[in-house]
Amino acid sequence: YDALGRLSSQTETAVDNKYLRKDYTYNGGNVSSIKYTSQSGVLTTENYNYANGHLVETKLNNQTSIFKLTKENDMGLPTEVRSGALSRTYGYDSYGFPTSRKIQKTGVTTFLQNMEYVFDPVKRNLTYRKDINVSQEEKFSYDNLNRLTSYKGLMATYDAKGNILTKGDVSGTFAYNTSGKPYAISSSSVANGIMSSATQVISYTSFKRPNAITQDGNVASFTYNGNQQRVKMQVAKGGSRLLTRYYLGDCYEIDETPSGNKEKLYLAGENYYDASAVLVKDHTNSWKLYYIGRDYLGSI
């Protein structure tokens, strides 16, 4: 920490000598930069610019702009954002629910992403969405307990405990008759071929996280830190390692495979799940910047 008690550096160390260090600088009480360093050396530096105390721009090494807020509405919600050569526009209704999300490259008339949404402002449920690029739309309805009852013209039904009995996209029913386990499926009349017949064996840690998952000779094993956060995953088949993945700092991943290694640093966001850009280094040892398009839930 610095003399004012502010975080000045943070190092997260995983297994196998992998680590991620973040060094912070400040200006006017706001974080002005974060430098990322790993076992590979210095990765990059994020620089932040503010207006009236609000973040308005993020740059890489004080050069490449990967996030720039250009417009917001009266509720303080972003309506226009620039990410490099990409323009992102967001629409909202009078309650602040999203109505549209678009991504367009500068100088190009077509959209990389063009989504529309409608929400029930009282129950806050999504009732309609459309992907204009592929001309696909979905309508949703819910019961008085906010459970999904229809989607894409299909129906879902529930028992008194809230268990799903039928789903329109699956031919068959589900039963929950195991004594002492009212929410565990005891049987299903789903047709053969819809559900996998492969046996999957899962073991757990003392803090109820998966320790290993085995299926068809494939084994995925997991390692956690003292905060019960996953820091390593290893996938193997027949004793041969297929993939080792390390997770660090909520923003850095390392993939090691027999064919080569890859590093990914997620940027312009709080963590993996809301970052709008990712810096990737593959086996050629060169870094490339990619931008991420997400829906309103954060899914890519």
Q: Over which residues does each language-model region extend?
A:
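Acidic glycine-/aspartate-rich tracts in secreted/extracellular proteins
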Residues: 170, 236-239
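Generic structural signal for coil-to-beta-strand starts
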Residues: 6, 30, 54, 77, ...
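Short glycine/acidic-enriched loop and turn motifs that connect beta-strands
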Residues: 15, 39, 106, 133-134, ...
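A surface-exposed, glycine/aromatic-enriched loop/edge motif typical of exported proteins
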Residues: 155-166, 171, 250-254, 297
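Short, small/polar residue-rich loop motifs at catalytic or cofactor-binding pockets
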Residues: 18-20, 41-44, 62-66, 84-86, ...
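Transmembrane beta-barrel strand/turn architecture of Gram-negative outer membrane proteins
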Residues: 221-235
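Short, ordered secondary-structure scaffold segments
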Residues: 49-50, 58-59, 64-82, 87-102, ...
